C-alpha cells in the first residue's frame, strides 16, 4: 500500500499497517474464577458472623437426668460500603470527520469503529480495576487506587494476619518446614466445619521470591525436574507442554509440597501516573521477595463462600432496588446531533469471609 513519505510529499512509501500499543491487562486472579459473584440490591450490605461453640461430650450416667448442653452461638454484625466507579467517554464529529483509519492509506474511519474502540477502552479499564481490587482483597483489605481504605478485613473479622518467612538467602533454610507451617495454618484456621482438603493452596509471588525459591540448593533439582513436558503432564494432568504446541510455557509455575507457586508480574498505572505492583507488601522493599498465599476454592463453584464480589445496582431510576450487575454501560445521543456519550457505572466490592486464610510470605528471615 502506497502513501506519501515523511521526507517529502513528492515521494511514496509503503504503508504496512497499524501497530497498537496497549498496556498489559494481566488478569491472572480474574481468570482463576476465585471470586463468586454475589449481586445485591443496595449500595451497602451487612454480614452476620456466627461463632459456634462445639466441644467434646462428657459421658454421663444413663440412670441420671444429667445431660450436656451447649452454649448459644455468638452473633455479631459487620457492614461494608460499596465502591462506586463511573467512567464517561464521548464521540464527537471531530473524531470521524476527515479522519483516516490507522493502518490504511485513504480509508476514512467510521462511527462504528470509534464506538468499538471506546467501548473496548471502558471494558479494559473496568477489568484491570477489578483485577486490582481482587488482588487487594487477597491481601485482606478493601482499598482503591488512591489508597482510600474502605475496610480492613482483619479488623472487621477480628483475626490476626499471618506472615511466613522462608529465609531463602540461607542455603540451609528448612523450606519444607515453612510450607508445612503454611499448610497447617490453612487447616487449623479454616473454620468451615471441615479442613481445607482438596483445595489447592496458591501462592502468587513476585519475581524476586520466585527466583530465590527456584535457585535455592534444596529446591533447584525439584524445579528443574518439572520443566520437561512429561513431568508437567504427570504433575497437572494437562496435555499442554509449553512452547512446542504454542501454549505459554510454565516456567513461572512450580509445585512443591502440595503448594502451587506462581510468579505474577501484574502492575497497573492509575490516573496520577503511579504504578501499582499487585504482588507487594507495604513498607517492604521490592528487593526482598514477597508473595500472597490463599486457598484456591474456585472448583467449589457456587458452594464457594470464602471469596465473593458484591455488585450493587446502577444509580438510575430503572435499576433502583434491583440486583446489581458487574458493569452497566449506557449510550446517549447529544443534543442537536453533536455526538454520542457513553456512561459506565459499577458498584462492586470484592472481599474474603475468612481473612485468616490470607497469608503473606517473605523470602527473608524473620527480623531480617
Curated annotation (Swiss-Prot):
This entry carries the following GO cellular component terms, namely: host cell cytoplasm; viral capsid
Q: Key word Hydrolase present in the record? A: no
Classify the source by domain of life.
Viruses
Decide whether keyword Methyltransferase is in the record. Answer: no
InterPro entries from the entry?
Major_capsid_GpE
Indicate the principal place this protein occupies in or around the cell: virion
Q: According to its UniProt record, where is this protein located?
A: Virion; Host cytoplasm
Q: Which UniProt keywords apply?
A: Capsid protein, Host cytoplasm, Late protein, Virion
Extent of the signal sequence: none
Q: Per the database entry, which stretches of residues form a coiled coil? A: none
Give the family from UniProt: Belongs to the lambda phage major capsid protein family.
Q: How is the quaternary structure described? A: Homomultimer.
What exactly does this protein do? Assembles to form an icosahedral capsid. The assembly is primed by the interaction between capsid assembly protease and portal dodecamer, and major capsid proteins assemble cooperatively to form the procapsid with the help of capsid scaffolding protein. Major capsid protein forms hexons and pentons of the icosahedron. Viral genomic DNA is packaged into the procapsid through the portal vertex. The packaging triggers a dramatic reconfiguration of the capsid shell.
Q: What is this protein called?
A: Major capsid protein
Recall the taxonomic lineage recorded for the source organism.
Viruses, Duplodnaviria, Heunggongvirae, Uroviricota, Caudoviricetes
Coding gene?
A: gene 58
Amino acid at each position: 500500500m502506497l502513501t506519501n513519505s515523511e521526507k517529502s510529499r513528492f515521494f511514496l512509501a509503503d504503508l504496512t499497517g497499524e501497530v497498537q500499543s496497549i498496556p498489559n491487562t494481566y488478569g491472572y486472579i480474574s481468570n482463576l474464577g476465585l471470586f463468586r459473584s454475589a449481586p445485591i440490591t443496595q449500595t451497602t450490605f451487612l454480614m452476620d458472623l456466627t461463632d459456634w461453640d462445639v466441644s467434646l461430650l462428657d459421658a454421663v450416667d444413663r440412670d441420671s437426668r444429667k445431660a450436656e448442653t451447649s452454649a448459644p452461638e455468638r452473633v455479631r454484625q459487620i457492614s461494608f460500603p460499596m465502591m462506586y466507579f463511573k467512567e464517561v467517554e464521548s464521540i464527537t464529529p471531530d473524531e470521524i470527520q476527515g479522519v483516516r483509519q490507522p493502518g490504511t492509506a485513504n480509508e476514512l474511519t467510521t462511527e462504528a469503529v470509534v464506538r468499538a474502540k471506546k467501548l473496548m477502552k471502558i471494558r479494559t479499564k473496568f477489568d484491570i480495576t477489578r483485577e486490582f481490587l481482587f488482588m487487594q482483597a487477597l491481601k485482606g483489605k478493601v482499598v482503591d487506587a488512591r489508597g482510600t481504605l474502605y475496610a480492613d478485613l482483619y479488623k472487621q473479622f477480628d483475626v490476626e494476619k499471618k506472615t511466613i518467612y522462608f529465609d531463602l538467602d540461607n542455603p540451609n533454610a528448612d523450606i519444607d518446614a515453612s510450607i508445612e507451617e503454611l499448610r497447617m495454618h490453612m487447616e487449623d484456621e479454616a473454620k468451615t466445619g471441615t479442613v481445607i482438603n482438596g483445595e489447592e493452596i496458591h501462592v502468587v509471588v513476585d519475581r524476586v521470591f520466585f527466583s530465590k525459591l527456584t535457585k535455592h540448593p534444596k529446591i533447584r533439582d525439584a524445579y528443574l525436574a518439572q520443566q520437561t513436558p512429561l513431568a508437567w503432564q504427570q504433575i497437572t494432568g494437562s496435555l499442554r507442554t509449553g512452547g512446542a504446541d504454542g501454549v505459554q510455557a510454565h516456567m513461572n509455575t512450580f509445585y512443591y509440597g502440595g503448594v502451587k507457586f506462581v510468579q505474577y508480574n501484574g502492575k497497573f498505572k492509575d490516573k496520577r501516573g503511579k504504578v501499582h505492583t499487585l504482588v507487594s507488601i507495604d513498607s517492604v522493599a521490592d528487593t526482598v521477595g514477597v508473595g500472597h498465599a490463599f486457598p484456591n476454592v474456585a472448583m467449589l463453584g457456587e458452594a464457594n463462600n470464602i471469596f465473593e464480589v458484591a455488585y450493587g445496582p446502577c444509580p438510575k431510576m430503572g435499576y433502583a432496588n434491583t440486583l446489581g450487575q458487574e458493569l452497566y454501560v449506557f449510550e446517549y445521543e447529544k443534543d442537536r446531533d453533536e455526538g454520542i456519550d457513553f456512561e459506565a457505572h459499577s458498584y462492586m466490592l470484592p472481599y474474603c469471609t475468612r481473612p485468616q486464610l490470607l497469608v503473606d510470605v517473605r523470602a527473608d528471615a524473620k527480623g531480617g
